[in-house]
């Protein structure tokens, strides 16, 4: 079972549908309606932290889930979930270089892990005003995708299967978003 933590976002069920193409065993829970202990009891094979409004400080249990389950379960964070990954490991999340709500832009990625099989650059959908600030990125996280102007678009933990995507792979404006989700579900992260 894949656990999808919902940060009260309208994209959560789009993400649910994409994940369901590759694994139909999904449980959706709200970020303030579950505990670490309950997640332990559920014993998901992986965890997805959804997009959402606001900042990691307002994302319920998400930062704690990332801290607790890193090294135990694969984790994918999308948009706010990506920012929660940054915050969980000590990065600063602050205003992005450019506010991007419902806009498409090209990102340049390293072609590994979640980006396996994809050309670089790839066009993605962005809906965010916050971003991980590069100069605060901890040593345990590596940047695996950026925009042309240097905004971080994806990070990966160097030792554990934890990946964050600032953009929305579940949006129709993201090229090859299904492939990215498929890579994650199949453990290619």
Residue ranges and their predicted role:
Residues 4, 125-126, 166:
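Short beta-strand segments
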Residues 27-33, 56, 105-108, 124-128, ...:
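Short gly/ser/thr-rich secondary-structure transition/capping motifs
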Residues 111-160:
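Catalytic beta-strand/loop cores that center a nucleophilic Ser/Cys/Thr
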């Amino acid at each position: 079972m894949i656990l999808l933590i919902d940060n009260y976002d309208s994209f959560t069920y789009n993400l649910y549908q994409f994940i369901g193409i590759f694994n139909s065993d999904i449980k959706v829970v709200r970020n303030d309606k579950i505990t670490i202990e309950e997640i332990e009891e559920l014993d998901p094979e992986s965890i997805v932290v959804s997009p959402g409004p606001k900042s990691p400080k307002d994302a319920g249990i998400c930062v704690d889930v990332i801290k607790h389950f890193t090294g135990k379960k694969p984790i994918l964070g999308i948009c706010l979930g990506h920012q929660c990954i940054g915050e969980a490991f000590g990065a600063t999340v602050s205003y992005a270089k450019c506010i991007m709500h419902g806009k498409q832009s090209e990102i340049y990625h390293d072609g590994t892990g979640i980006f396996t099989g994809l050309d670089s650059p790839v066009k993605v959908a962005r809906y965010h005003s916050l971003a991980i600030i590069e100069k605060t990125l901890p040593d345990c996280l590596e940047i695996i995708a950026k925009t042309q102007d240097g905004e971080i678009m994806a990070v990966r933990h160097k030792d554990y299967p934890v990946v964050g995507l600032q953009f929305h792979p579940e949006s129709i404006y993201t090229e090859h978003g299904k492939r990215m989700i498929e890579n994650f579900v199949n453990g290619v992260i």
